Structures are given as C-alpha cells and as structure tokens.
C-alpha cells in the first residue's frame, strides 16, 4: 500500500505511543516478539499485548524502524531537538527492534547520567531486547556499564555507613540485581545454543558482583547441573562450570583462607572460623568427584558428544593441578592424615568393604565431631568417595571402548587416553 510521508509519520508516532502505553498498562512484560503479518488487515494498532507478552505485527516494522532510526540520528547531529521523554520512548522502541544500534545505547547512558532513567529500568529494557535477540553483543556490553554504575550508586558513603538501614537497603538492591542478572543470563542461554555472550557475561557478573562469595559459586554450580545435562553439546555452558570449579578452588585454597581469616565483616565478625578449615579441605575433592561422575553419566547416556569429553579432560586437569598443589602445600610439615588424604589415596587401595572404609573415617575424624558442618555430615553418611585418578580414568576408557558401538565415541575415548598418557602421565 502506498502511503504519503505525512501518513507514515502519523502512523509511526501512533505505534511508538502504543508501545509506551503498553508498558504503562503492564509493567511486568517479560518477552517481546514479531507477529508474522505481511500487511495490515484490520484498522487496529499493530501492538498486541497478551498477558505479559508484547507482540509487534511485522508489517509496521518497515515503517517504524527507519523512522525512529532517523529521528535519533537527527538528534545526535543536532539537527532536531527531542525532549527527554521523547528520547526515552524513541530509544526504547528502536532498541526493542534493533538492540545492536550503539548510538541508542549511548543516548540512554546520557539519560542515566543525568538522572532521567534509573539503572533498573534500563536493565529491564535490555532484558526485553534479549528475549528477542539473546546474543546481541551491544546489549550485553551496555548491561555491564549499567551494572558498574549501579554498584557505584550502592557503594556506601561515609554518612551511609553510619545509617545501617540505608546500607542494608543498598545491599539488598545489589543482591536483587545479581539474582536478576543470573536469571537473564540463563534465559538468554536457553534461547540461543552456545550463547558465548551470555555465558561470558555471567562470568563477568561473578567476578565483579559476587567475587569471593562462596554461596553464590556453590549455588551456580548446583543450578547449572541440570541445564548442562539437557544441553550436552553446549561448550559455553560447560566452560562456565569449569570457571566455577577454578573459582572455588582458588577461594578455598590455603592462601585465600588465610586472607579470609584476617578480614572482617562490617559488623566486626570474622568471615571464617576454625571449623571452616576442616570442612574446606573436603569440599574440593567432593566437587571434583561429583563433576567427573556427571561427565561419566552424560558420556554413557549421550555417546558421541565431543563437548562432554572436552569437559572431562578439563575437569580432570583441574583436579590433577589442585591435587599437586595441595600435596606441595603440605610440604615437609608432614601434617596429620585427614579425611581429604584418605580420599586422595583411596584410588590406590584395594576394594575394601564399605564398613571398613567408614570405620577408618570415624577413627580419623573422631577428634573433630564438634566442628562438623552440615555438608561434612552429609559426606560422612556414605562410603568414602572414589576420587578420579590415572588408573580409574583408564578403567573408564576401557569400559567405554569395550561396549561402544558409536565410532565417534570410540574416537573421542582414544583421543582422551592419548591425552592422559602424554600430558598427565608424564
């Protein structure tokens, strides 16, 4: 259909207003999308709002996108003046349709800096843009800028430090932002396979908003277990778990624990106790065992997926490095045998009975009953974990090759064995 320039302007202005009104009517919109519709069949708005879903009929995009794009460029070139409210509406519409338009994000940065927008509102727009374009690099880059600004806003000043209520509110604000960011990353990863941008952003969030937070690291390792089990070819998801294991190993290292002991919380309490040391020695062997067991289950259930073998290789290498550093850390001090040492040496023992293993466990740790944590107790209820080792990995490979009918699975198993012999076996 042929429209005059004036008619197009009126149409587009109405559509922009309809989008703005849709967000006012329902501030809980959580997804946007295009509705395939080659031409306008009815005399009605092309903006469709159903529950928390916002749809835009595709016929209007060819008019809408060039209009808002040109409007914003004219503003940046100082050829046309737009008030702040109009800028918010135009940039919102433009970024929902094309989130990789850097100029629009830069305009919103200026609006944030002058106080027209708040960080949470801008993060919400980015979340909606990612529901349609989950890999948009400009959106992820902008989110990091906004999160850094949010952190600065929540950093307590001298006066706020005296106001415990205000300090607590800012802390809760950051905590909500952290939880929301993890949800956004998970949703984007589910919408686009091997979404490197989403997983990289998730790592950035951990490094900048949850640095040294063991609870967040443990929760992330637990929450992504099911996800990777359902996406066995997603390299980025498994790489994220590798990052979590490395971060946990670093935070639970003796050097890190020493730093933790000397640090204090704002309330003056130490962040770690002596009982934590005993517990931390057992955490990493258990986590490595669980990760290797996860790899075993997935490799046997989904043969022929190279991602799983690559992940197993990386996890075993991390375990090998951690074990070597742990042994070197003991040095010549000849420390007393601990539960961890039993776990490390279990692979060298014959197949003793479960009751015998549990008796050894009780003897070794009988003097530490008062310092058990809940995780330690859970670990003690079963037999000692068989930790991954060079012999156990060769046994696993032999079992795979013996019963394997998938040529790709055999090729990956043989390659893994060569890697073990050439890298670990040296």
UniProtKB/Swiss-Prot annotation:
Alphabetical keyword list: Prenyltransferase, Repeat, Transferase
InterPro entries in the cross-refs: Prenyl_trans_a
Protein name per its UniProtKB record: Protein prenyltransferase alpha subunit repeat-containing protein 1
UniProt KW Repeat keyword: yes
Chain spans, region Disordered: 255-279
GO molecular function, one term: protein prenyltransferase activity
Segments annotated as PFTA repeats: 86-119, 121-154, 180-213, 219-252, 290-323
GO cellular component, one term: cytoplasm
Skewed-composition ranges (Polar residues): 262-275
Family note: Belongs to the protein prenyltransferase subunit alpha family.
